[in-house]
From Swiss-Prot:
TM region(s), chain numbering: 257-277
GO MF annotation list: oxidoreductase activity
EC number: 1.-.-.-
Role, per record: Probable copper-dependent oxygenase; part of the gene cluster that mediates the biosynthesis of squalestatin S1 (SQS1, also known as zaragozic acid A), a heavily oxidized fungal polyketide that offers potent cholesterol lowering activity by targeting squalene synthase (SS). SQS1 is composed of a 2,8-dioxobicyclic[3.2.1]octane-3,4,5-tricarboxyclic acid core that is connected to two lipophilic polyketide arms.
Keyword check for Transcription: no
Metabolic or biological pathway, per its Swiss-Prot or TrEMBL entry: Secondary metabolite biosynthesis
Protein topology in the membrane: Single-pass membrane protein
Major location (coarse): membrane
Name the UniProt record assigns to this protein: Probable copper-dependent oxygenase clz3
Subcellular location: Membrane
Gene encoding the protein: clz3
GO cellular component terms attached to this protein's record: membrane
Keyword Glycoprotein attached: yes
Amino acid sequence: MSANLEYPNGTTADAENGMWLHHILFYNKANRDDICGEKKPGQRFFGSGNDRTPLDLTDGGKNKLGYHIGHNDQFFISVELMNMHFSSQVVVLTAHWKFVEEPYSKYELGTPYWFDVASCGRSDVPATNNAIFDFISPPVRLDFHGRMAYLSNHVHDGAFLHEVKKNGKTICSVNPQYSSADGADGIVHLSHVPPCSNAGPVAPGDEVSLTASYDTTKYKPMINEDGTLEPVMGVTLAYIVKGTAPVENDSGGRLYFAVPLAAIAFIALIISGGYVIYSAKQQKAWPKWLSRRQKYQSVGTEVESFITR
């Protein structure tokens, strides 16, 4: 999935020529947002900014991962565009999709989770000029087993580091990339925010948070028409494949099973050995007892034959 802003002739309209795709966000009205619930109008499953970084769930064809679109699903978008020119501009907002028709049994189902430094409010947070600062999201506690399959990250101009953490340990760390040429406003702008893929398993009780780090002494933030600073963002759209609890390693399982079996076998061996020793002693004592009894009471021929052994 990708979004773009173009001129009618098909050329890209971006910060270098004074047109900004500030942000675009796709909602699926048929599904409930898994983090914010009814606070959001639907499930957020795709977003993009002026960097136009695509959402490639397959990671270049390495993974069979997708987002399910039902027959009755309804999409709507939230979009903000900016024109840095003093005259009106005609532009076209485009969205490109790659999809697989049913059946798609070879693909895993990814569920989108929107982690945001602003939690469930507006994603905008205030910027500071000529400063180094961080925004840290409230931790989100998960209640299921699964796998962090793909993480799409979004920040604004001024960001130099974006990290996603699970239980305090970093599972995704990216450095936003900037264009080599100045934009129409004379400053460099974001050109790409790298994603992360296969960021590891998750389990009930795991807490996920993110940190968006900004350095506006090095990278100039965006400025509004009135000269004030444009708010910044820190977002990770994580596609999680839900599943069952991981199975213990087979070799370890067999070892745990083999130990009690070996103990049982060892005990049985001791018992059988003791029985053999006891039987041998009993076999030697039995004839003596019979011979003494023979003195006052006769015994059968089978017993007599046993005595003579």
